[in-house]
Amino acid sequence: MRPAGRSNNQVRPVTLTRNYTKHAEGSVLVEFGDTKVLCTASIEEGVPRFLKGQGQGWITAEYGMLPRSTHTRNAREAAKGKQGGRTMEIQRLIARALRAAVDLKALGEFTITLDCDVLQADGGTRTASITGACVALADALQKLVENGKLKTNPMKGMVAAVSVGIVNGEAVCDLEYVEDSAAETDMNVVMTEDGRIIEVQGTAEGEPFTHEELLTLLALARGGIESIVATQKAALAN
């Protein structure tokens, strides 16, 4: 029996609260069960030096965890003087995922920074960050259109992510912390709304997994992501 009695293919309750803060062009509080992440999208005119004069935009991301988002306090990375490898890996993943959602040529020479701050962690913080940041990004892009900075919205479609894994020999979707810490296999999957794969991060933490198990996990992820995308679209429609 999974925590909260979920079936193996069931994601946790997903909530997306838009316009959560007042200053950012897009802001979303995303909740996957007890995992809560604040995602903001900030627009700047201009692009990094390596893109200057090419007529296209850029999307980047930063990720961080509040000191007491976890069971025991973790010192802020700013206090340590440097970002950890996990943080850098996750923020690059978020940026890659969200660039797949946008026509960067149509964006023009704007940079959008997605800041994902974990308020409470109970597994799946990177997948929640991608899911919430995509909605914040959609709001920010719509503001560029409404303000006359862009003629058409460069958003190609929604992007969402979910964790899948093998726990006690069973393939399950959207792992919370107690499952994640005991998983034999742990995988994060990012997809477009039509089911195309952007990224797969998978590791056999305990027992190696088979090709058949990989296909099972990807199918589980696709079903979970379809449900999450429906929640994203419902949030944007309100």
Swiss-Prot record:
Q: Name one GO biological process term.
A: rRNA catabolic process
Q: Per the record, what are the reactions this protein catalyses? A: tRNA(n+1) + phosphate = tRNA(n) + a ribonucleoside 5'-diphosphate
**Which parts form a coiled-coil structure per UniProt?**
none
Domain of life, per lineage: Bacteria
Residues where phosphate binds: 86, 124-126
Q: Which UniProt keywords apply?
A: Nucleotidyltransferase, RNA-binding, rRNA processing, Transferase, tRNA processing, tRNA-binding
Question: EC?
Answer: 2.7.7.56
- The question of whether Zinc is a record keyword is answered with no
Which CDD domains does this UniProt record tie to the protein? RNase_PH_bact
Show the GO MF annotations.
3'-5'-RNA exonuclease activity; tRNA binding; tRNA nucleotidyltransferase activity
In terms of Pfam families, this protein maps to:
RNase_PH, RNase_PH_C
Family (UniProt): Belongs to the RNase PH family.
Subunit structure, as described in the record: Homohexameric ring arranged as a trimer of dimers.
What does it do? Phosphorolytic 3'-5' exoribonuclease that plays an important role in tRNA 3'-end maturation. Removes nucleotide residues following the 3'-CCA terminus of tRNAs; can also add nucleotides to the ends of RNA molecules by using nucleoside diphosphates as substrates, but this may not be physiologically important. Probably plays a role in initiation of 16S rRNA degradation (leading to ribosome degradation) during starvation.
What protein name does the entry list? Ribonuclease PH
Q: Which organism is it from?
A: Escherichia coli O1:K1 / APEC
Gene name linked to the record:
rph
